[in-house]
Amino acid sequence: MITTRFAPSPTGFLHVGGVRTALFSWLYARHNNGKFLLRIEDTDLERSTQAAVDAILDGMSWLGLKNDEEIYYQTKRFDRYHEVIKQLIAEGKAYYCNCSKERLDELREHQQANNLKTGYDGKCRDASYIPQEGDSFVVRFKNPQDGLVSWDDAVKGRISISNHELDDMIIQRTDGSPTYNFCVVVDDIDMAITHIIRGDDHVNNTPKQINIYKALNAHVPVFAHVPMILGPDGAKLSKRHGAVNVMQYREDGYLPQAILNYLVRLGWSHGDQEIFSIDEMIKSFNLEHINASPSRFDFDKLKWLNKHYIKESKFEDIRTEVEYHFAKFGLDIANGPDLQDLVAVMAEKVDTLVELTEKSSYFYSDDIVYDEKAVKKHVKTTTGEIFIKLLENFEALETQQWQDPDTLHNVVASTAEQCEVGMGKVGMPLRIAITGSGQSPDIGITLKLLGKEKVLSRLQRAIKELCNS
């Protein structure tokens, strides 16, 4: 069975680069009816935090990237790592090394001074040193000294490294803790991982890991090293570019569907198709069409996709996110129009759910603030009389007539005729009175969504506060 994994370290938050790796791994497993597993690589006890673990899990949950088994934690597997280390030592594939820090520092200085390749020189490789109580020692892996380490990378093609370029790496530190390159191999063997999809910053680790797989007589998985994501300026993606906790995108009003759609196309293609549902991603995704070159993060493209999903999604698919932002903004959705009706009207005017909430607040909150510039421009000495006439005309409408935007628009137009002024002399002041600003959807739709009670009370307030009468 095809089995992939995502293995973040909880030393920082989950950012878009990690999310894309997780997405590619998840999609490949789903495409092949396989399994997707999640492993938390938390062996760096000094830098790993529970807050970072929680952020990773929150991000994966928000995006809908569900793992198929219980989460693996490396800190719960130390006994297993030590078991395998003892096995390698017993088989002559690893050895104890008691070289002092001073000796290793001198070795490195000598190598650098003579333009030699830096690395351990194998002094303890064939020695018969056995640690005694109180000794300071490490355990090193006996890397092959001849030949090549080669693999057919699913993204980068054939890669070969001479074993002469690799030294005998440490697999257990002086404090007894196992090292990263060793742990991940044991984990991937035990988890039966068949395909490792990860960032290409791991390419240099791969030959070391392949040699450990072979030493353990284990099947070597397929590797797919995905190029990094660059900022819009071509520099390494940083916080100023968008390399922030993925949950910040939620706070900024992006939909998970938009994030996933954007990231799947960031370095992977399927013809000219830009819009992908989750099901379409699963059906189409493969490793062959991952681009071997880095991709640049494009905020405008992400906003365009987010706008698309706000406009085109079934409301039930985005309801949770919309309600989240309204609650965060302190708006009571029971005190206004149905959210589905609101989104249908406002979607064309916004790129994010934060914008949607901010631009829609007057529908749900009576605490509107008048835009001074709009008031100064559109509210005149005769506006009070117009507002009074509007009140009369709106009060005369039956309840069901408030459900028809055209009827409400016609009331505004007929009021303009009655007052012998142009439509703009009525519509703009009315818009300011009921929304606080000179911008809103079509006046008939705005009136319908607000409803009779709100419109009348806000007109009465405007007469008192804006018209001094």
From Swiss-Prot:
Top enzyme category: ligase
Sites where the protein binds Zn(2+): 97, 99, 124, 126
Residues spanned by motif 'HIGH' region: 8-18
Cofactor(s) recorded in Swiss-Prot or TrEMBL: Zn(2+)
PROSITE patterns (alphabetical): AA_TRNA_LIGASE_I
Gene Ontology MF term list: ATP binding; glutamate-tRNA ligase activity; tRNA binding; zinc ion binding
InterPro entries membership: aa-tRNA-synth_I_cd-bd (IPR045462), aa-tRNA-synth_I_codon-bd_sub2 (IPR020751), aa-tRNA-synth_I_CS (IPR001412), aa_tRNA-synth_I_cd-bd_sf (IPR008925), Glu-tRNA-ligase_bac/mito (IPR004527), Glu/Gln-tRNA-synth (IPR000924), Glu/Gln-tRNA-synth_Ib_cat-dom (IPR020058), GluQ/Sye (IPR049940)
Motif interval(s): 'KMSKS' region: 236-240
S-S bridge residues: none
One cellular component (GO) term of this entry: cytosol
Family statement: Belongs to the class-I aminoacyl-tRNA synthetase family. Glutamate--tRNA ligase type 1 subfamily.
Quaternary context: Monomer.
Name of this protein: Glutamate--tRNA ligase
Originating species: Francisella philomiragia subsp. philomiragia (strain ATCC 25017 / CCUG 19701 / FSC 153 / O#319-036)
Gene name for this UniProt entry: gltX
